[in-house]
């Protein structure tokens, strides 16, 4: 289990990418599509925000768990990019039916709350998850 205990952007995704060959199941159990992480696989660069980086390991099962906050629009873009490159998500990606969804209203609320903080704002990514 790898946990990020800061504000994010600690390099968790790259560490998971290094560790994935040693495991059969790679699962995201919480979090959302904030900044994402950039990985290079077979000479191509990919930005993953929702899909676990084990997707590049041909025989691994990847899980998006019920604690994950999933933006369906960003997820679809990410999935299309991976599919165009030959990564078959249908056989190797499992999404919990209890995963939370980010809706456009969440992004609007996020922006309004951040604006209301004035000089005390924390610099949200504006993705609707705070």
Predicted feature descriptions by range:
Residues 1-129:
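Non-transmembrane, aqueous-exposed alpha-helical and coiled segments at domain scale
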